[in-house]
Amino acid sequence: IRASDWSSDVCSSDLGLVNTREMFAKAIKGGYAVPAFNFNNMEQLQAIIQAAAETKSPVILQVSKGARNYANQTLLRYMAEGAVAYAKELGWEKPQIVLHLDHGDSFELCKSCVDMGFSSVMIDGSHLPYDENVALTKKVVEYAHQFDVTVEGELGVLAGVEDEVSAEHHTYTRPEEVVDFVSKTGCDSLAISIGTSHGANKFKPEQCTRNADGLLVPPPLRFDVLEGVEKELPGFPIVLHGSSSVPQEEVATINKYGGALKDAIGIPEEELRHAATSAVCKINIDSDSRLAMTAAVREVFATKPAEFDPRKYLGPARDNMKKLYKHKIENVLGSAGKAE
């Protein structure tokens, strides 16, 4: 595939976006991780950019296939361009913002995102036989690299449900496969499976223990798998999906005001802090912002039942998400001040 065969409609750099190459190299060297926050709408995007601008943190705006369908690809492109301008308006002179496709499931989808101005794409062939995953990932890499778009591949399968992505069981990444996969595909980063999981119910109660207060305690992440991968691929950018911590105060608020989230449990933040100091340089967080948004909206609906102006409940939702994002940046991932 040559650049002359296909032409990209919009270049990510024209939108003011950056890819992940330099961002990840700095993160590995600096012992922190870059937040990758999923967004579907304006309030989420405002909250992400406000949090990143105020903390001067590099940030990855993630869009799933479902979010792309929901928000419309053309609007997303202009939202991303607007996000860069908005960040500058907030006083962030040199914003480091990536627009990334999360869980791309086909070459055609990845190509479309590259052509629409995305600066990074993920091709998830982890559900395919190994050789087919290699071939698909390589095809995406060959196309994307012509336009300086970085590519994330995946080895291993996460359990849980997120948009169209679902799996019953974990398949842990096999460290002995990673060198072969990266060398054959040319991918720029690798998502691995070490026990994180999609959704707000990351583990079944029978997989957990309970503490003295009767609260569920999730099984620990498989840091031995991560260490095995790092040993095989020293200094290579590693990605963790399904890394929401499912804040129990948000779950409690949702349930207090009519919700029905049972046994919602996430990844402990201390484990994510530990991962962020390793070669893990991108940590994906989606469910936590959904919980923060829903908690704020439910509280307004319950405490101010006469309210019907969307700004009166989406405003508090935006504020609650921003608070969450800043907490993740400053206290969990360690990325504050890394994009001055």
Each model region followed by its residue ranges:
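Terminal accessory/targeting
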Residues: G30-F39, E340
